A protein has these predicted regions:
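FIC/Doc superfamily catalytic core
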Residues: 1-36, 42-50, 58, 62-502
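Conserved two-metal-ion catalytic palm core of "right-hand" nucleic acid polymerases
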Residues: 54
Length: 502
Protein backbone atom coordinates (compact mmCIF):
# COMPACT_ATOMS: atom_id res chain seq x y z
CA UNK A 1 0.00 0.00 0.00
CA UNK A 2 1.36 3.40 -0.98
CA UNK A 3 2.47 5.75 1.77
CA UNK A 4 1.15 9.30 2.06
CA UNK A 5 4.46 10.58 0.71
CA UNK A 6 4.17 8.29 -2.32
CA UNK A 7 0.59 9.41 -2.95
CA UNK A 8 1.66 13.04 -2.73
CA UNK A 9 4.50 12.37 -5.15
CA UNK A 10 2.06 10.80 -7.61
CA UNK A 11 -0.20 13.85 -7.45
CA UNK A 12 2.75 16.19 -7.95
CA UNK A 13 3.78 14.15 -10.98
CA UNK A 14 0.33 14.78 -12.49
CA UNK A 15 0.75 18.49 -11.82
CA UNK A 16 4.21 18.43 -13.41
CA UNK A 17 2.77 16.91 -16.59
CA UNK A 18 0.23 19.71 -16.80
CA UNK A 19 2.95 22.33 -16.25
CA UNK A 20 4.96 20.87 -19.13
CA UNK A 21 2.00 21.49 -21.44
CA UNK A 22 1.02 24.99 -20.29
CA UNK A 23 3.05 27.97 -19.13
CA UNK A 24 0.48 28.59 -16.40
CA UNK A 25 -1.77 25.80 -15.12
CA UNK A 26 -5.46 26.72 -14.90
CA UNK A 27 -7.83 23.86 -14.13
CA UNK A 28 -11.56 23.50 -14.57
CA UNK A 29 -12.62 20.86 -12.09
CA UNK A 30 -11.61 17.34 -13.06
CA UNK A 31 -11.49 17.97 -16.82
CA UNK A 32 -7.70 17.49 -16.86
CA UNK A 33 -6.88 15.82 -13.55
CA UNK A 34 -8.50 13.14 -11.40
CA UNK A 35 -10.60 14.06 -8.37
CA UNK A 36 -8.23 12.38 -5.92
CA UNK A 37 -5.18 14.22 -7.25
CA UNK A 38 -7.09 17.50 -7.38
CA UNK A 39 -8.21 17.22 -3.77
CA UNK A 40 -4.78 16.20 -2.53
CA UNK A 41 -3.03 19.05 -4.34
CA UNK A 42 -5.61 21.54 -3.11
CA UNK A 43 -5.40 20.36 0.49
CA UNK A 44 -1.61 20.62 0.47
CA UNK A 45 -1.35 24.08 -1.06
CA UNK A 46 -0.24 23.10 -4.57
CA UNK A 47 -3.49 24.45 -6.02
CA UNK A 48 -5.60 27.46 -5.05
CA UNK A 49 -9.31 27.87 -5.77
CA UNK A 50 -10.18 30.98 -7.78
CA UNK A 51 -13.91 30.34 -7.86
CA UNK A 52 -16.05 27.25 -7.50
CA UNK A 53 -14.63 24.54 -9.76
CA UNK A 54 -11.69 26.61 -11.03
CA UNK A 55 -8.11 26.37 -9.76
CA UNK A 56 -4.61 27.70 -10.42
CA UNK A 57 -1.25 26.13 -9.62
CA UNK A 58 0.42 27.49 -6.47
CA UNK A 59 3.01 26.59 -3.85
CA UNK A 60 2.47 25.68 -0.20
CA UNK A 61 2.87 28.68 2.07
CA UNK A 62 1.76 31.26 -0.50
CA UNK A 63 -1.79 31.50 0.83
CA UNK A 64 -2.66 35.18 1.23
CA UNK A 65 0.12 36.25 -1.16
CA UNK A 66 -1.32 37.99 -4.23
CA UNK A 67 1.67 37.14 -6.43
CA UNK A 68 0.37 33.73 -7.56
CA UNK A 69 -2.94 35.25 -8.60
CA UNK A 70 -1.48 38.26 -10.40
CA UNK A 71 0.93 35.93 -12.21
CA UNK A 72 -1.95 33.69 -13.32
CA UNK A 73 -4.57 36.39 -13.85
CA UNK A 74 -4.66 36.80 -17.64
CA UNK A 75 -4.08 33.08 -18.25
CA UNK A 76 -7.12 32.37 -16.08
CA UNK A 77 -9.27 34.93 -17.92
CA UNK A 78 -8.31 33.48 -21.31
CA UNK A 79 -9.00 29.87 -20.34
CA UNK A 80 -12.23 30.62 -18.47
CA UNK A 81 -13.58 32.57 -21.45
CA UNK A 82 -12.53 29.89 -23.93
CA UNK A 83 -14.21 27.13 -21.92
CA UNK A 84 -17.41 29.08 -21.19
CA UNK A 85 -17.80 31.06 -24.40
CA UNK A 86 -15.89 29.23 -27.12
CA UNK A 87 -14.33 31.62 -29.63
CA UNK A 88 -17.10 34.24 -29.68
CA UNK A 89 -15.76 36.63 -27.07
CA UNK A 90 -13.31 39.47 -26.66
CA UNK A 91 -12.24 42.09 -24.18
CA UNK A 92 -13.82 45.52 -24.52
CA UNK A 93 -12.28 48.08 -26.86
CA UNK A 94 -10.87 49.98 -23.85
CA UNK A 95 -9.22 46.95 -22.27
CA UNK A 96 -7.97 45.80 -25.66
CA UNK A 97 -6.16 49.14 -25.98
CA UNK A 98 -4.65 48.68 -22.52
CA UNK A 99 -2.97 45.49 -23.69
CA UNK A 100 -1.93 46.85 -27.09
CA UNK A 101 -0.31 49.82 -25.33
CA UNK A 102 1.87 47.67 -23.09
CA UNK A 103 -0.02 48.46 -19.90
CA UNK A 104 0.82 45.56 -17.62
CA UNK A 105 -1.19 46.35 -14.49
CA UNK A 106 -3.72 43.72 -13.41
CA UNK A 107 -7.12 45.48 -13.51
CA UNK A 108 -9.65 45.38 -10.70
CA UNK A 109 -12.33 44.20 -13.15
CA UNK A 110 -12.15 42.60 -16.58
CA UNK A 111 -15.11 43.10 -18.91
CA UNK A 112 -15.66 40.53 -21.65
CA UNK A 113 -18.14 40.97 -24.49
CA UNK A 114 -19.87 37.91 -25.94
CA UNK A 115 -23.21 36.98 -27.51
CA UNK A 116 -23.31 34.31 -24.76
CA UNK A 117 -22.79 36.85 -21.98
CA UNK A 118 -25.03 36.77 -18.91
CA UNK A 119 -24.42 40.33 -17.60
CA UNK A 120 -23.39 39.04 -14.19
CA UNK A 121 -20.29 39.94 -12.21
CA UNK A 122 -18.19 37.01 -11.01
CA UNK A 123 -16.01 37.69 -7.98
CA UNK A 124 -12.44 36.41 -8.28
CA UNK A 125 -9.47 36.39 -5.91
CA UNK A 126 -8.18 39.44 -4.03
CA UNK A 127 -11.03 41.84 -4.86
CA UNK A 128 -10.81 41.33 -8.62
CA UNK A 129 -13.83 40.42 -10.70
CA UNK A 130 -15.04 39.43 -14.16
CA UNK A 131 -18.11 40.76 -15.97
CA UNK A 132 -19.27 38.87 -19.08
CA UNK A 133 -21.43 41.35 -20.95
CA UNK A 134 -23.96 40.19 -23.54
CA UNK A 135 -23.02 41.97 -26.73
CA UNK A 136 -22.02 41.43 -30.31
CA UNK A 137 -18.30 41.44 -30.99
CA UNK A 138 -16.17 42.35 -34.04
CA UNK A 139 -16.45 40.01 -37.02
CA UNK A 140 -12.80 39.16 -36.54
CA UNK A 141 -10.89 39.37 -33.28
CA UNK A 142 -7.14 39.45 -32.65
CA UNK A 143 -5.71 36.51 -30.68
CA UNK A 144 -3.12 38.06 -28.36
CA UNK A 145 -0.12 35.66 -28.32
CA UNK A 146 1.14 36.02 -24.73
CA UNK A 147 -1.97 34.86 -22.85
CA UNK A 148 -4.38 33.80 -25.61
CA UNK A 149 -6.78 36.70 -25.04
CA UNK A 150 -9.25 37.77 -27.73
CA UNK A 151 -8.96 41.50 -28.44
CA UNK A 152 -10.58 44.04 -30.71
CA UNK A 153 -8.33 44.62 -33.74
CA UNK A 154 -6.25 47.73 -32.99
CA UNK A 155 -7.94 50.09 -35.45
CA UNK A 156 -11.41 48.95 -34.39
CA UNK A 157 -10.50 49.33 -30.72
CA UNK A 158 -9.45 52.95 -31.30
CA UNK A 159 -12.69 53.71 -33.13
CA UNK A 160 -14.90 52.09 -30.49
CA UNK A 161 -13.04 53.20 -27.37
CA UNK A 162 -15.20 55.20 -24.99
CA UNK A 163 -14.71 59.00 -25.01
CA UNK A 164 -13.65 58.80 -21.36
CA UNK A 165 -10.78 56.47 -22.21
CA UNK A 166 -8.91 59.29 -23.97
CA UNK A 167 -8.99 61.28 -20.75
CA UNK A 168 -8.46 58.62 -18.09
CA UNK A 169 -5.94 56.50 -20.05
CA UNK A 170 -4.31 59.15 -22.20
CA UNK A 171 -0.89 57.45 -22.20
CA UNK A 172 -2.38 54.17 -23.44
CA UNK A 173 -4.60 55.94 -25.99
CA UNK A 174 -1.75 58.01 -27.44
CA UNK A 175 0.54 54.99 -27.47
CA UNK A 176 -1.98 53.05 -29.57
CA UNK A 177 -2.59 55.99 -31.91
CA UNK A 178 1.16 56.11 -32.57
CA UNK A 179 1.06 52.43 -33.64
CA UNK A 180 -1.15 53.26 -36.65
CA UNK A 181 0.90 53.68 -39.84
CA UNK A 182 -1.82 55.20 -42.07
CA UNK A 183 -5.55 55.87 -42.16
CA UNK A 184 -6.62 52.82 -44.20
CA UNK A 185 -7.58 50.42 -41.39
CA UNK A 186 -9.32 53.17 -39.42
CA UNK A 187 -11.31 54.24 -42.47
CA UNK A 188 -12.41 50.68 -43.24
CA UNK A 189 -14.04 50.49 -39.82
CA UNK A 190 -15.58 53.96 -40.04
CA UNK A 191 -16.97 53.61 -43.57
CA UNK A 192 -18.34 50.12 -42.96
CA UNK A 193 -20.37 51.33 -40.00
CA UNK A 194 -21.06 54.91 -41.05
CA UNK A 195 -19.63 56.17 -37.78
CA UNK A 196 -19.51 59.93 -38.38
CA UNK A 197 -19.42 60.91 -34.69
CA UNK A 198 -16.60 58.47 -33.98
CA UNK A 199 -14.80 59.69 -37.10
CA UNK A 200 -14.72 63.22 -35.71
CA UNK A 201 -13.36 61.99 -32.38
CA UNK A 202 -10.65 59.75 -33.82
CA UNK A 203 -9.58 62.44 -36.30
CA UNK A 204 -9.24 64.87 -33.40
CA UNK A 205 -7.21 62.29 -31.49
CA UNK A 206 -4.74 61.86 -34.34
CA UNK A 207 -4.42 65.62 -34.73
CA UNK A 208 -3.73 65.87 -30.99
CA UNK A 209 -0.64 63.64 -31.25
CA UNK A 210 0.60 65.60 -34.26
CA UNK A 211 -0.43 63.18 -37.01
CA UNK A 212 -2.05 65.74 -39.28
CA UNK A 213 -1.93 63.48 -42.34
CA UNK A 214 -4.12 60.74 -40.84
CA UNK A 215 -6.48 63.28 -39.25
CA UNK A 216 -7.01 65.08 -42.58
CA UNK A 217 -7.41 61.78 -44.44
CA UNK A 218 -10.15 60.61 -42.07
CA UNK A 219 -12.10 63.86 -42.33
CA UNK A 220 -11.78 64.27 -46.10
CA UNK A 221 -12.58 60.63 -46.91
CA UNK A 222 -15.64 60.49 -44.65
CA UNK A 223 -16.94 63.79 -46.01
CA UNK A 224 -16.29 62.49 -49.51
CA UNK A 225 -18.68 59.64 -48.73
CA UNK A 226 -21.29 62.16 -47.61
CA UNK A 227 -20.89 61.93 -43.83
CA UNK A 228 -21.20 65.05 -41.68
CA UNK A 229 -17.94 64.83 -39.72
CA UNK A 230 -17.29 67.37 -36.98
CA UNK A 231 -13.82 66.98 -35.60
CA UNK A 232 -13.32 67.15 -31.83
CA UNK A 233 -10.27 66.52 -29.65
CA UNK A 234 -11.08 63.80 -27.06
CA UNK A 235 -7.98 64.60 -25.00
CA UNK A 236 -7.84 67.29 -22.33
CA UNK A 237 -4.24 68.33 -23.04
CA UNK A 238 -1.56 68.28 -25.71
CA UNK A 239 1.67 66.25 -25.71
CA UNK A 240 4.78 68.45 -25.63
CA UNK A 241 6.12 66.98 -28.87
CA UNK A 242 4.38 65.22 -31.77
CA UNK A 243 4.40 61.43 -31.62
CA UNK A 244 5.89 59.46 -34.48
CA UNK A 245 4.93 56.01 -35.75
CA UNK A 246 6.33 53.25 -33.53
CA UNK A 247 5.90 49.50 -33.96
CA UNK A 248 6.71 48.88 -30.29
CA UNK A 249 4.17 50.40 -27.88
CA UNK A 250 6.76 50.49 -25.11
CA UNK A 251 8.81 53.18 -26.84
CA UNK A 252 5.88 55.59 -26.94
CA UNK A 253 4.54 54.55 -23.53
CA UNK A 254 7.83 55.23 -21.74
CA UNK A 255 8.30 58.60 -23.42
CA UNK A 256 4.77 59.67 -22.51
CA UNK A 257 5.15 58.44 -18.93
CA UNK A 258 8.38 60.43 -18.58
CA UNK A 259 6.71 63.55 -19.98
CA UNK A 260 3.74 63.06 -17.67
CA UNK A 261 5.85 62.61 -14.52
CA UNK A 262 8.85 64.92 -14.85
CA UNK A 263 7.21 68.22 -13.84
CA UNK A 264 5.94 66.71 -10.59
CA UNK A 265 9.47 65.61 -9.69
CA UNK A 266 10.85 69.10 -10.38
CA UNK A 267 8.12 70.60 -8.21
CA UNK A 268 8.77 68.31 -5.23
CA UNK A 269 12.57 68.01 -5.26
CA UNK A 270 15.11 70.35 -3.61
CA UNK A 271 17.19 72.49 -5.94
CA UNK A 272 20.32 70.79 -7.25
CA UNK A 273 23.58 71.90 -5.59
CA UNK A 274 25.28 72.03 -8.98
CA UNK A 275 28.64 70.99 -10.38
CA UNK A 276 31.08 69.31 -7.99
CA UNK A 277 34.53 70.91 -8.16
CA UNK A 278 36.22 68.64 -5.60
CA UNK A 279 35.76 65.30 -7.35
CA UNK A 280 38.07 63.35 -5.04
CA UNK A 281 36.38 64.82 -1.98
CA UNK A 282 32.97 63.76 -3.30
CA UNK A 283 34.24 60.24 -4.00
CA UNK A 284 35.59 60.01 -0.45
CA UNK A 285 32.11 60.89 0.82
CA UNK A 286 30.72 58.08 -1.35
CA UNK A 287 33.23 55.64 0.16
CA UNK A 288 32.11 56.67 3.64
CA UNK A 289 28.53 55.75 2.74
CA UNK A 290 29.36 52.21 1.58
CA UNK A 291 28.73 50.27 4.80
CA UNK A 292 25.48 52.08 5.60
CA UNK A 293 24.26 51.81 2.02
CA UNK A 294 25.09 48.11 1.71
CA UNK A 295 23.32 47.24 4.95
CA UNK A 296 20.10 49.08 4.07
CA UNK A 297 19.98 48.26 0.34
CA UNK A 298 20.46 44.53 0.94
CA UNK A 299 18.11 44.50 3.93
CA UNK A 300 15.37 46.10 1.80
CA UNK A 301 15.59 43.04 -0.45
CA UNK A 302 15.37 40.59 2.44
CA UNK A 303 19.01 39.57 2.85
CA UNK A 304 20.34 39.08 6.37
CA UNK A 305 23.54 41.07 6.44
CA UNK A 306 25.29 42.42 9.51
CA UNK A 307 27.70 45.35 9.70
CA UNK A 308 30.39 42.78 10.58
CA UNK A 309 29.75 40.80 7.39
CA UNK A 310 29.81 43.97 5.29
CA UNK A 311 33.15 45.00 6.82
CA UNK A 312 34.50 41.49 6.30
CA UNK A 313 33.91 41.58 2.55
CA UNK A 314 35.07 45.19 2.26
CA UNK A 315 38.54 44.49 3.66
CA UNK A 316 38.86 41.29 1.62
CA UNK A 317 38.61 38.83 4.52
CA UNK A 318 36.24 36.68 2.49
CA UNK A 319 37.02 33.13 1.44
CA UNK A 320 34.34 31.72 -0.85
CA UNK A 321 36.15 28.41 -1.18
CA UNK A 322 35.98 27.85 2.58
CA UNK A 323 33.38 28.66 5.21
CA UNK A 324 31.36 31.13 3.13
CA UNK A 325 30.91 28.97 0.04
CA UNK A 326 27.29 28.15 0.88
CA UNK A 327 26.64 31.43 2.61
CA UNK A 328 24.38 33.30 0.20
CA UNK A 329 24.35 36.43 2.31
CA UNK A 330 28.14 36.62 2.12
CA UNK A 331 28.08 36.14 -1.65
CA UNK A 332 25.49 38.88 -2.03
CA UNK A 333 27.41 41.22 0.26
CA UNK A 334 30.63 40.69 -1.66
CA UNK A 335 28.82 41.26 -4.94
CA UNK A 336 27.36 44.47 -3.58
CA UNK A 337 30.82 45.71 -2.64
CA UNK A 338 32.19 44.97 -6.10
CA UNK A 339 29.21 46.61 -7.81
CA UNK A 340 29.50 49.63 -5.51
CA UNK A 341 33.10 50.12 -6.64
CA UNK A 342 31.99 49.95 -10.28
CA UNK A 343 29.28 52.55 -9.64
CA UNK A 344 31.88 54.73 -7.93
CA UNK A 345 33.92 54.61 -11.14
CA UNK A 346 30.89 55.67 -13.18
CA UNK A 347 30.25 58.57 -10.82
CA UNK A 348 33.87 59.65 -11.21
CA UNK A 349 33.38 59.80 -14.99
CA UNK A 350 30.14 61.77 -14.59
CA UNK A 351 31.73 64.31 -12.24
CA UNK A 352 34.56 64.76 -14.74
CA UNK A 353 32.09 65.74 -17.44
CA UNK A 354 30.70 62.60 -19.08
CA UNK A 355 26.97 62.71 -19.86
CA UNK A 356 25.22 60.86 -17.03
CA UNK A 357 22.84 58.94 -19.28
CA UNK A 358 25.64 57.82 -21.59
CA UNK A 359 27.82 56.82 -18.63
CA UNK A 360 25.14 54.63 -17.07
CA UNK A 361 24.19 53.15 -20.46
CA UNK A 362 27.80 52.06 -20.94
CA UNK A 363 28.55 50.92 -17.39
CA UNK A 364 25.39 49.33 -15.99
CA UNK A 365 26.22 45.90 -17.50
CA UNK A 366 29.50 46.04 -15.54
CA UNK A 367 27.64 46.90 -12.32
CA UNK A 368 25.41 43.89 -12.83
CA UNK A 369 28.29 41.59 -13.68
CA UNK A 370 30.19 42.62 -10.54
CA UNK A 371 27.06 42.21 -8.40
CA UNK A 372 26.82 38.52 -9.31
CA UNK A 373 30.46 37.63 -9.96
CA UNK A 374 30.90 35.96 -6.52
CA UNK A 375 28.22 33.46 -7.56
CA UNK A 376 30.30 32.66 -10.65
CA UNK A 377 33.39 32.26 -8.47
CA UNK A 378 31.76 29.49 -6.43
CA UNK A 379 30.06 27.84 -9.44
CA UNK A 380 26.44 28.76 -8.68
CA UNK A 381 26.13 30.87 -11.84
CA UNK A 382 27.86 30.65 -15.21
CA UNK A 383 29.54 33.64 -16.86
CA UNK A 384 26.97 33.65 -19.64
CA UNK A 385 24.23 34.13 -17.03
CA UNK A 386 25.54 37.65 -16.44
CA UNK A 387 25.44 38.74 -20.08
CA UNK A 388 22.53 40.78 -21.42
CA UNK A 389 19.03 41.29 -20.11
CA UNK A 390 16.67 38.59 -18.94
CA UNK A 391 15.18 36.11 -21.40
CA UNK A 392 12.28 35.01 -19.19
CA UNK A 393 9.29 36.68 -17.57
CA UNK A 394 9.69 37.97 -14.03
CA UNK A 395 7.13 39.02 -11.43
CA UNK A 396 7.28 41.31 -8.40
CA UNK A 397 5.97 39.74 -5.23
CA UNK A 398 2.62 41.21 -4.21
CA UNK A 399 2.52 43.78 -7.03
CA UNK A 400 -0.30 44.45 -9.49
CA UNK A 401 2.36 45.63 -11.92
CA UNK A 402 3.69 42.92 -14.23
CA UNK A 403 7.14 43.88 -15.57
CA UNK A 404 7.69 44.05 -19.31
CA UNK A 405 8.10 40.84 -21.28
CA UNK A 406 11.67 39.99 -22.39
CA UNK A 407 11.23 41.30 -25.95
CA UNK A 408 9.78 44.55 -24.64
CA UNK A 409 12.76 44.96 -22.31
CA UNK A 410 15.00 45.20 -25.37
CA UNK A 411 12.75 47.88 -26.83
CA UNK A 412 12.50 49.80 -23.57
CA UNK A 413 16.05 50.00 -22.22
CA UNK A 414 17.49 52.08 -25.10
CA UNK A 415 14.57 54.49 -24.64
CA UNK A 416 15.34 54.82 -20.92
CA UNK A 417 18.94 55.72 -21.61
CA UNK A 418 17.96 58.20 -24.33
CA UNK A 419 15.61 59.86 -21.84
CA UNK A 420 18.37 60.01 -19.23
CA UNK A 421 20.83 61.38 -21.77
CA UNK A 422 18.54 64.20 -22.89
CA UNK A 423 16.89 65.11 -19.56
CA UNK A 424 18.26 68.48 -18.35
CA UNK A 425 17.14 68.25 -14.70
CA UNK A 426 19.26 65.99 -12.44
CA UNK A 427 16.42 65.32 -9.98
CA UNK A 428 14.27 64.00 -12.83
CA UNK A 429 17.14 61.83 -14.03
CA UNK A 430 17.52 60.45 -10.50
CA UNK A 431 13.90 59.81 -9.53
CA UNK A 432 12.62 58.66 -12.92
CA UNK A 433 15.83 56.81 -13.71
CA UNK A 434 15.34 54.69 -10.60
CA UNK A 435 11.60 54.27 -11.10
CA UNK A 436 11.77 53.40 -14.81
CA UNK A 437 14.56 50.89 -14.20
CA UNK A 438 12.50 48.89 -11.71
CA UNK A 439 9.32 49.41 -13.78
CA UNK A 440 11.04 47.68 -16.72
CA UNK A 441 12.81 45.15 -14.44
CA UNK A 442 15.45 44.20 -17.04
CA UNK A 443 17.14 41.48 -14.97
CA UNK A 444 15.90 38.32 -13.29
CA UNK A 445 17.21 39.51 -9.90
CA UNK A 446 18.94 42.54 -8.41
CA UNK A 447 16.73 45.17 -10.08
CA UNK A 448 16.11 47.06 -6.84
CA UNK A 449 19.82 47.36 -6.09
CA UNK A 450 20.53 48.38 -9.68
CA UNK A 451 17.74 50.97 -9.54
CA UNK A 452 19.20 52.52 -6.40
CA UNK A 453 22.62 52.62 -8.08
CA UNK A 454 21.04 54.49 -11.01
CA UNK A 455 19.43 56.86 -8.49
CA UNK A 456 22.76 57.72 -6.90
CA UNK A 457 24.68 58.04 -10.15
CA UNK A 458 22.09 60.55 -11.34
CA UNK A 459 22.02 62.37 -7.99
CA UNK A 460 25.78 62.80 -8.28
CA UNK A 461 25.30 64.39 -11.71
CA UNK A 462 23.44 67.23 -9.98
CA UNK A 463 25.79 67.54 -7.03
CA UNK A 464 23.46 65.81 -4.55
CA UNK A 465 25.07 63.54 -1.95
CA UNK A 466 24.91 59.74 -2.11
CA UNK A 467 21.51 58.90 -0.65
CA UNK A 468 20.64 55.80 1.37
CA UNK A 469 17.08 54.44 1.38
CA UNK A 470 16.77 53.07 4.95
CA UNK A 471 15.20 49.68 5.52
CA UNK A 472 13.00 51.28 8.19
CA UNK A 473 11.20 53.11 5.36
CA UNK A 474 10.92 50.05 3.12
CA UNK A 475 7.12 49.84 3.34
CA UNK A 476 6.69 53.51 2.40
CA UNK A 477 9.28 53.23 -0.37
CA UNK A 478 7.71 50.10 -1.91
CA UNK A 479 4.19 51.50 -1.63
CA UNK A 480 5.29 54.63 -3.49
CA UNK A 481 6.90 52.55 -6.27
CA UNK A 482 3.70 50.50 -6.56
CA UNK A 483 1.57 53.64 -6.83
CA UNK A 484 3.77 55.00 -9.58
CA UNK A 485 3.71 51.67 -11.46
CA UNK A 486 -0.02 50.99 -11.16
CA UNK A 487 -1.57 54.47 -11.05
CA UNK A 488 1.08 56.48 -12.89
CA UNK A 489 1.40 58.85 -9.91
CA UNK A 490 5.06 59.61 -9.18
CA UNK A 491 4.43 62.19 -6.44
CA UNK A 492 4.75 59.87 -3.42
CA UNK A 493 7.95 58.31 -4.72
CA UNK A 494 9.43 61.73 -5.47
CA UNK A 495 8.54 62.85 -1.93
CA UNK A 496 10.20 59.79 -0.38
CA UNK A 497 13.45 60.33 -2.27
CA UNK A 498 13.39 64.11 -1.74
CA UNK A 499 13.00 63.62 2.02
CA UNK A 500 16.14 61.45 2.09
CA UNK A 501 18.41 63.71 0.05
CA UNK A 502 20.76 65.72 2.26
Amino acid sequence: MATMAEKMAASLEELRKLQEKDRCVVLQGTAEIGRTHLTRLLDNGWLQEVMKGWYIAARPGTEGDTTIWYTSFWYFIAKYAAVRLGERWCLTADQSLDLYSGKTTVPVQVVIKSPKGHNNTQKLMYDTSLLVFQSEIPDQVYKEPEYGLNLYPLAEALVYATPRYFQVEKIAARTCLAMIRDAADILKVLTKNGASLRAGRIAGAFRNIGNIEIADSIVSTMRGFGYDVREEDPFEDQPRTPLVYEVSPYVTRLRLMWENMRDKVVELFPEAPGKIDDVEGYLRSVDEKYSEDAYHSLSIEGYRVSPELIEKVRVGNWKPEEEDKEHKNALVARGYYQAFQAVRGTISDILKGKNAGEAVRADHPVWYMQMWMPFVTVGILQREDLVGYRTGQVYIRGSQHIPLNPKAVRDAMPVLFDLLKNEPHPAVRAVLGHFFFVYIHPYMDGNGRMGRFVLNAMLASGGYNWTVVPVERRKEYMKALEKASVEGDISEFAKVIASLVK
